[in-house]
């Protein structure tokens, strides 16, 4: 029998909301977004439930960031398995995913070129709502406030289109970067989630392409 904490109905709602937000945008929700979605009067009410989930070992709270919520993947997997679901998919229909881990990407070459693949990971499908195609090792702290830290493994679904606000893997010139996409009347901007880093404004003459969408995250402590 799987060992997992018992959640209240409200705690399960919040966990489902966190998982759905990470799958949809690549980042967890803010306290204000949780409060608004679930009808709490204030973000403080959401914080109380998050603290309870942290005490039960379901999530880890990262101080100093508005989106500092990180899933403890082993515990979440057990909870999903006990419910007989994996983000709405029948558990019995799922097999382990074999995902290539992409390290540094050479200028001008495809992300999934063989020379970029460091190794292949066997990953539980229950960690994701949207099936990823590969893992990308995060370098740097430009997405810190989205809960994406240096050394984390970002789960990426290959895609060439994205909605405003989604976290994307983008190619700009000879560089590949992970940022939040924003389209304006003036053009495309790539937004960091750390005030120490500048907004990247894509010039019309620059070579720019979306390579993928962030659909999940594996903490660096899990990737060793």
UniProtKB/Swiss-Prot annotation:
SUPFAM superfamilies, alphabetized: LexA/Signal peptidase (SSF51306), Winged helix' DNA-binding domain (SSF46785)
Site (Cleavage) location in chain: 107-108
Enzyme superclass (EC): hydrolase
EC number(s) given by UniProt: 3.4.21.88
Active site: 142 (for autocatalytic cleavage activity), 179 (for autocatalytic cleavage activity)
DNA-binding region extent: 31-51
Transmembrane regions: none
CDD domains: S24_LexA-like
Keyword line: Autocatalytic cleavage, DNA damage, DNA repair, DNA replication, DNA-binding, Hydrolase, Repressor, SOS response, Transcription, Transcription regulation
Taxonomy, superkingdom: Bacteria
InterPro entries reported in the protein's UniProt record: LexA, LexA-like, LexA/Signal_pep-like_sf, LexA_DNA-bd_dom, LexA_repressor, Peptidase_S24_LexA, Peptidase_S24_S26A/B/C, WH-like_DNA-bd_sf
Reactions the enzyme catalyzes: Hydrolysis of Ala-|-Gly bond in repressor LexA
UniProt-listed GO biological process terms: DNA repair; DNA replication; negative regulation of DNA-templated transcription; proteolysis; SOS response
GO MF terms, alphabetically ordered: DNA binding; serine-type endopeptidase activity
Classification via Gene3D superfamilies: Umud Fragment, subunit A, Winged helix-like DNA-binding domain superfamily/Winged helix DNA-binding domain
Quaternary structure and interacting proteins, as annotated: Homodimer.
UniProt function note: Represses a number of genes involved in the response to DNA damage (SOS response), including recA and lexA. In the presence of single-stranded DNA, RecA interacts with LexA causing an autocatalytic cleavage which disrupts the DNA-binding part of LexA, leading to derepression of the SOS regulon and eventually DNA repair.
NCBIfam families tied to this protein: lexA
Family: Belongs to the peptidase S24 family.
Protein name: LexA repressor
Organism: Delftia acidovorans (strain DSM 14801 / SPH-1)
Gene expressing this chain: lexA
């Amino acid at each position: 029998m799987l060992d997992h904490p018992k959640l209240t109905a409200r705690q399960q709602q919040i966990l489902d909301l966190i998982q759905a937000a990470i799958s949809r945008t690549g980042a967890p929700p803010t306290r204000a977004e949780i409060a608004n979605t679930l009808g709490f009067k204030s973000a403080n009410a959401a914080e109380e439930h998050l603290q309870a989930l942290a005490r039960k070992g379901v999530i880890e709270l990262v101080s100093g960031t508005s989106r500092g919520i990180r899933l403890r993947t082993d515990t979440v997997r057990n909870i999903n398995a006990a419910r007989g679901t994996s983000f709405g998919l029948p558990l019995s229909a799922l097999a382990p995913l074999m995902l290539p881990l992409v390290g540094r990407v050479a200028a001008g070459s495809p992300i999934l070129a063989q020379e970029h693949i460091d190794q292949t990971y066997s990953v539980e499908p229950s960690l994701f709502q949207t099936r990823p195609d590969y893992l990308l090792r995060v370098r740097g702290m430009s997405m810190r406030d989205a809960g994406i830290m240096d050394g984390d493994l970002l789960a990426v679904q290959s895609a060439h289109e994205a909605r405003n606000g989604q976290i994307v893997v983008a190619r700009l010139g000879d560089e590949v970067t992970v940022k939040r996409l924003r389209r304006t009347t003036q053009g495309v901007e790539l937004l960091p989630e750390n005030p120490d880093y500048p907004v990247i404004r894509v010039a019309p003459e620059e070579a720019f392409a979306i390579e993928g969408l962030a659909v999940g995250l594996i903490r660096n402590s899990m990737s060793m």
